[in-house]
Amino acid sequence: MAISDEPETVATALNHSSLRRRPTAAGLFNSPETTTDSSGDDLAKDSGSDDSISSDAANSQPQQKQDTDFSVLKFAYRPSVPAHRKVKESPLSSDTIFRQSHAGLFNLCIVVLVAVNSRLIIENLMKYGWLIKSGFWFSSKSLRDWPLFMCCLSLVVFPFAAFIVEKLAQQKCIPEPVVVVLHIIITSASLFYPVLVILRCDSAFLSGVTLMLFACVVWLKLVSYAHTNYDMRALTKSVEKGEALPDTLNMDYPYNVSFKSLAYFLVAPTLCYQPSYPRTPYIRKGWLFRQLVKLIIFTGVMGFIIEQYINPIVQNSQHPLKGNLLYAIERVLKLSVPNLYVWLCMFYCFFHLWLNILAELLRFGDREFYQDWWNAKTVEDYWRMWNMPVHKWMIRHLYFPCLRHGIPKAVALLIAFLVSALFHELCIAVPCHIFKLWAFGGIMFQVPLVFITNYLQNKFRNSMVGNMIFWFIFSILGQPMCVLLYYHDLMNRKGKLD
């Protein structure tokens, strides 16, 4: 027997009864005897009385429908009618739980989450008061961070230099090896120049992080710009030699070095260069205003959680590698929830709000800045889905070029994580002036987790196992531990300087 998920209701039973005793078209509203008699009378009547017949039928419809419903109800759920007809499972049993809709439970979780966090916020304010201060983000030194600001503005020099090199290469004024060397010099200078400025200036943490993020974005864009133009020159030479290009390239633009294309690429929410992008027809001003309001609100929420919850927790903690183990575990677990809230707010503010705002202003069409990484079954799925601009850059300019040069997939994956770890370390360690390789080690630790979660996924064929491991390692253990490590090292450094 087939197991049905639909519960049998009274309406279903009524329907079954009506199906078993469905009247014919001629006897829909009358009994069989009445139908036989009336049919004989109708043959004797004049055919010109159609209007009177239709009027009588219209008047008798409510009464006839009521009689039919009563007839159906008369035989519905009688004691002799079986109440159990099919083999059925309970809605929460293991065989049917994932085929049920849990929208009501999801709403309940939201209500409970709002209620519990509202109580915690009120309790925190009553116990500790208003703790928000700007000193951690913008101190008196922030006004003296003008070298970092000037360095940020001067980063546009490097794309302009790359454009000059590409223009010379297009006109065949310099050979290809010289083009490659010049691009290596330009991209390296665009990254090391901000690092030197930050290390020489004792700037605020947020100012240093902002400059390093800008520098990393410029470096990634310059690499994509140089690599894409190099590949387009190679394809152009192949066409000139008469070689046929495969249709899978999908290149709908010619090789042309344009400063307008470079300028648009520098401000567009993408890290992969191409001479033209899909564009939307117009700017939605109302939608843009709503996203700006959301950005302001969620940025404020993120700052509130950091100052009101995370800072007091880390200030009242010990170094996780030097104190009591149980105490360190308690601090990490206590820090995990507000840290997760901040990370989710950061993701929503940057990847959803800010990048979409920038795309709307520039009419940038491809807005797949992330995928459903929260459903990641493995650690590899998470890194492939949560940051699509970086992921597309990695597979376009690093991973597949490694495969084309005969490097095994495992080694290419290791190289991709190595590059990611280096940039994570630069963005955190340089502004903190601390080089303990905590961020680097945290990213490289993902490599064995990739193979472990892939093995578990293939062994158990259960998405829940990998997803829970991902959430535990990522939000409960990894990030809070890194926050505590960098905070205490930063405080120790400030104490030594003072």
Swiss-Prot record:
Subcellular location: Endoplasmic reticulum membrane
Tissue expr: Highly expressed in flowers and pods. Expressed at low levels in roots, stems and leaves.
Swiss-Prot/TrEMBL induction comment: Induced by heat shock, insect biting and abscisic acid (ABA). Down-regulated by cold stress and treatment with jasmonate.
EC annotation from Swiss-Prot or TrEMBL: 2.3.1.20
Positions of the catalytic residues: 424
EC class (word): transferase
Transmembrane segments: 102-122, 146-166, 178-198, 203-223, 253-273, 295-315, 342-362, 410-430, 432-452, 465-485
Alphabetical list of Pfam families matching this protein: MBOAT (PF03062)
InterPro entries hit by this protein: Diacylglycerol_acylTrfase1, MBOAT_fam, Oat_ACAT_DAG_ARE
GO CC, any one term: chloroplast envelope
Role: Major contributor to triacylglycerol (TAG) synthesis and oil accumulation in developing seeds. Catalyzes the acylation of the sn-3 hydroxy group of sn-1,2-diacylglycerol using acyl-CoA. Has a marked preference for oleoyl-CoA (18:1) and sn-1,2-dioleoylglycerol over vernoloyl-CoA and sn-1,2-divernoloylglycerol. Can use oleoyl-CoA, linoleoyl-CoA and linolenoyl-CoA as substrates.
Protein name (record): Diacylglycerol O-acyltransferase 1A
UniProt lineage: Eukaryota, Viridiplantae, Streptophyta, Embryophyta, Tracheophyta
